[in-house]
Amino acid sequence: MKKILALMGAVLLLSVSARAVEVSAPSAVLMEKETGTVLFAKNEHEKLEPASVTKIMTLLLTMEAIDGGTLRYEDTVTASPHACSMGGSQIWLKEGERLTVDEMLKAVCVVSANDCAVALAEHLAGSEEAFVERMNRRAAELGMNDTTFKNACGLPAEGHVTSAYDIAL
């Protein structure tokens, strides 16, 4: 009798009702890493401004260049007038100022430095516009069908969009 009561008590205590997940964000995705299975989605393909999440693609292309041997951490990057004109978060590079790739990467990662993101982009591709073409090409290769980049740092620009789904990829 005690075993039956204990079992019934355990069942009562362990019974939990599932309720819907409430997410206040306009869109969200929870994706299993190995299989890509979507476990939760809310407006996952809604196109939104990516802001500084853009810098993840800038960092990816920079790291791929390092891995590919076309760029080294010790290489020097010179700040152009265009890179120095960025608004938002920055380290206030001065025109002609030179930092190593390593220093620029740290500034992008720690400070979210727009000026350094653009300086790296220009260093790698000759211009921010040419680098953005690379960003969009790489996004397409990754299957990021909701994403269009317009700049290397994430400052607002018409048509500069991505989705929660694409970010999850």
Where are these regions (language model features)?
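Positively charged n-region of N-terminal signal peptides that target proteins for export
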Residues: 1-4
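Bacterial N-terminal signal peptides
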Residues: 7-15
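Active-site-adjacent loops and short helices of periplasmic peptidoglycan-processing enzymes
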Residues: 18-165
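Acidic, His- and aromatic-enriched active-site or binding-groove loops in soluble protein domains
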Residues: 168
